UniProtKB/Swiss-Prot annotation:
EC numbers on record: 2.7.1.137
EC class: transferase
Keyword Cytoplasm attributed: no
Name this polypeptide is given: Phosphatidylinositol 3-kinase VPS34-like
Region (Catalytic loop): 669-677
The organism of origin for this protein: Dictyostelium discoideum
Domain PI3K/PI4K catalytic: 532-800
Length: 816
């Protein structure tokens, strides 16, 4: 204890007691304005009704608390135990941190996040707050504090926190609350008769304030109190070097439990910042560097690997694949490392466009990485509009990681997308609809971000393009109203189809049968002028999608399916990836006759799908042609002089398309395959539709690794035919070509992890790892081919009479 003339206190360095706080109560109501209006509207999201959005009574929440200093985590996160609340959200639980009072730096901050269990696999933040342990006068805070909870975000531990728990106020309520704290701590003399009136008045003002701020929530915490105040004082460093207590003159070995984490890494960087410009690795170090560079993108670099890359950074400037790894090693909050990285970055060999996508991911969101993101955009500018369209969906997602405050020119990526989209309406139309969908996602916390971007982009359009977008919006809105109205009718499907045609021909939706040219949102290359009423249809499905024939300005008909109540964002993503893979294969002169039809989500549960005509479900083909695909091809494309009596180009197309889709569905983990979502065209193309299950998910037990059904093999002439041998050869060739573009594929997936697509966002890291696992990047091309052939052989074995248990289960998969 230290004593001055007027003030007695303890030094914090003299308190060897673990720091603890008490979590008391949560007050106020959560802001639900962004929530869906009813649970029934989103009944498919079966867990949502159990979350805090739909329960006005108490809910089972839990809290995590972490200590931060200088923007870095000091301790592990401590959390409250399970507590089923019955009346109010009241914990009254003490959290004990592993650090003692004497260990706490002056800028130590408590970062608190309140969590709600959204589903068995997902948690969402109710809100977060942060609170400095020491006041500006260096005295440790104590007693009860009422902290503002910043809703729908985690507590922020940065030095300039975005979730301050205490906001300085100037009103009477704020002044009285400060006085009440002093009163509770007996820093103000008590006067019983006067205190009664004062406390009642404070209570009245508090209730009035709560009614004004009804959508704010507060957490009350209680900090430890001691007999005397605690003044911050650091431990003095020893001025001598402790010697061994033994008399022997020998080295003393000390076990450093943190050795694997390299606690001296930062100092090493400082001491070696401008060294090693001419240093070259030896054989062992070179192998280590080579192994690191072979790692997939988004792989976390260990401390040991980071030191190796940092040491030979100048040597690596000639290797364009090394730049992203080097930038991941940089501690961007450290000014010396930031300056060194930014100075060496322009000297590096320019990276590929595929690698530039990694620099736009969530790994580079620190305020000091703005130049890294700007560099990535400069690389991206090399892509033409056709190539850019293949990445546009992910680039729109990457805008959420930009430092954007409403001015597009401050963000290199946003300004680039605006510029390119303004120059090309095909690009601009897709850009607009991607922004539109993300601006209305109720499951996303980025709605306002995308709404702002959408409005800013629309304002920048010239008069012609603005009219085009307005026409698209009106067309989609009218289709949506028509679909909803038909769904509400309590009549048979046949009657609904009849009603649909009447409504389009002469009813209230007659305007949809004839209008001024509109760029079709799903394919802006096409201009449409109306719907053909007599060819309109409603498909047999729970969602009752509309089948429409659209008249084009070229006098042709273009078929689309308009869906309401169906989230097409996942299908849109998979079709985009299939289109990209088709392009990658064709660049290597391998055309596998894929059919990447077009899909566009126009709202969270609305969208348009291009129809592929003519085409027919495999189940229907087998039913009509005695279970024989060859009969189907022979009927439409006979050639008496060719094997099986079928035109050679048709068989070639069938074999190639089977190979392409087998490999792609394997890499993407497409599930729930059956004969109704495999389609055939008369000219031999096979293609897949409906991608509700991806990344290995499947409603059926033990799905086969390769989506190859018996009918496909028989359609090639059987497993011993030359066509099947060619099929296997094409599979291996396609697989290795796509493996070479693994960085591009994985980077595109990484940019989608925060897109609120459940199959990906439910487990972000695992989603990317599942694709990475299928690519088998650790294998050589020959090893990868052998692995794929083994999978094909296992699948074929399962399809034909071989008595093994697993084969039987895989055969049942296709029969289900």
């Amino acid at each position: 204890m230290k004593v001055s003339k007027d003030f007695k206190f303890y030094y914090s360095r003299d308190i060897p007691i673990k720091y603890k706080i008490k979590l008391c109560t949560l007050e106020g109501k959560r802001n639900k304005e962004n929530a869906p209006e009813t649970v029934d509207k989103w009944i498919e999201k079966k867990y949502l009704k159990y979350s805090s959005l739909y329960r006005d009574t108490t809910i089972d929440l839990y809290i995590t608390c972490t200590l931060y200093s200088d923007g870095k985590q000091l301790s592990t996160s401590e959390h409250t135990s399970y507590n089923p609340f019955s009346v109010s959200n009241k914990w009254d639980e003490t959290i004990i941190f592993p650090l003692k009072h004497q260990d706490l730096p002056f800028d130590t901050m408590i970062v608190i996040t309140i969590w709600d269990i959204y589903s068995p696999m997902k948690k969402v933040p109710i809100g977060g707050t942060s609170f400095n342990i020491f006041g500006m006068n260096k005295i440790e805070r104590k007693g009860k504090h009422k902290l503002l909870i910043w809703q729908d975000r985690e507590g922020d531990g940065e030095k300039e926190t975005t979730t301050p728990g205490q906001i300085q106020g100037k009103d009477e309520q704020y002044r009285l609350e400060k006085l009440k704290k002093k009163y509770d701590r007996k820093l103000i003399n008590h006067c019983q008769w006067l205190d009664k009136f004062s406390l009642n008045e404070i209570e009245r003002l508090s209730r009035a304030s709560e009614s004004l701020n009804k959508n704010q929530i507060y957490l009350t915490i209680e900090l430890p109190e001691f007999e005397l105040p605690i003044l911050f004082k650091q431990q003095n460093c020893p001025l001598y070097i402790p010697l061994s207590q033994t008399q022997k003159k020998s080295l003393v070995l000390i076990n450093d439990i943190e050795m694997d984490e390299h606690p001296s890494e930062q100092k090493y960087h400082r001491l070696n910042l401008y060294d090693h410009k001419d240093l070259k690795p030896n054989s062992t170090e070179l192998k280590g560097l080579t192994d690191i560079l072979k790692q997939p993108p988004n792989t976390k670099v260990t401390s040991k690997e980071a030191l190796l890359i940092w040491r030979f950074r100048y040597y690596l400037t000639n290797n364009k694949k090394a730049l992203t790894k080097f930038l991941r090693c940089v501690e961007w909050s450290e000014s010396h490392q930031k300056n060194e990285a930014l100075s060496i970055m322009p000297k590096w060999d320019p990276i590929d466009i595929a690698d530039s996508l990694e620099l736009l991911s969530s790994a580079f969101t620190h305020k000091n990485t703005i130049m890294v993101r700007r560099y990535a955009v400069e690389i991206l500018k090399k892509a033409d509009d056709e190539e850019l369209l293949y990445y546009l969906l992910q680039l729109v997602q990457a805008t959420k990681y930009e430092q954007f405050d409403g001015n597009p020119s401050d963000s290199p990526l946003i300004s680039f997308l605006f510029e390119r989209s303004n120059k090309n309406f095909i690009l601009g139309s897709h850009f607009y609809w991607y922004l539109t969908v993300d601006s209305v996602l109720k499951s996303s916390i980025f709605c306002s971000h995308y709404k702002t971007l959408q409005e800013l982009y629309f304002r920048q359009l010239d008069h012609t393009d603005a009219q085009r977008v307005n026409a698209q919006n009106k067309f989609i809105s009218r289709l949506s109203l028509l679909s909803v109205e038909l769904k509400a009718m309590n009549i048979t499907r046949e009657k609904k189809i009849e009603k649909l045609r009447i409504m389009l021909a002469e009813g209230e939706y007659k305007d949809l049968s004839d209008f001024q040219p509109i760029r079709l949102p799903v394919n802006p290359d096409i201009e449409i002028i109306g719907i053909v009423p007599e060819k309109s249809n409603i498909y047999k499905s729970a969602k009752s999608p509309l089948g429409l024939k659209l008249r084009t300005t070229k006098g042709e008909e273009y078929g689309v399916i308009f869906k309401t109540g169906d989230d097409l964002r996942q299908d849109q993503l998979i079709i985009q990836l299939i289109s990209l893979m088709d392009r990658l294969l064709k660049k290597e002169n391998l055309d596998l006759k894929l059919t990447p039809y077009k899909v566009l989500a126009t709202a969270e549960e609305d969208g348009i799908v291009e129809m592929v005509n003519p085409s027919e479900a495999m189940a229907s083909v087998l039913s009509k042609y005695d279970g024989d695909i060859l009969k189907f091809f022979k009927t439409h494309n006979p050639d008496a002089d060719s094997p099986y009596g079928i035109a050679p180009e048709v068989m070639d197309t069938f074999v190639k398309s089977c190979a392409g889709y087998c490999v792609i569905t394997y890499i993407l983990g497409i599930g729930d395959r059956h004969l109704d979502n495999l389609l055939l065209t008369p000219n031999g193309k096979l293609f897949h539709i409906d991608f509700g299950y991806i990344l290995g998910k499947d409603p059926k037990i033990l799905p086969p690794p390769m989506k190859l059904c018996k009918e496909m093999v028989l359609g090639m002439g059987g497993e011993n035919s030359k066509h099947y041998e060619k099929f296997k050869q094409l599979c291996c060739e396609a697989y290795n070509i796509l493996r070479k573009s693994s960085h591009l594929i994985l980077n595109l997936f990484a940019l989608m992890v925060d897109a609120s697509i459940p199959s990906i966002s439910d487990d972000k890291e695992k989603s990317i790892l599942k694709v990475q696992e299928k690519l088998q990047l650790e294998l050589t091309d020959q090893e990868a081919s052998n692995s794929l052939l083994q999978l094909l052989n296992d699948s074929v074995t399962a399809l034909f009479p071989v008595i093994i248990e697993m084969a039987h289960k895989w055969l049942q998969y296709w029969k289900a």
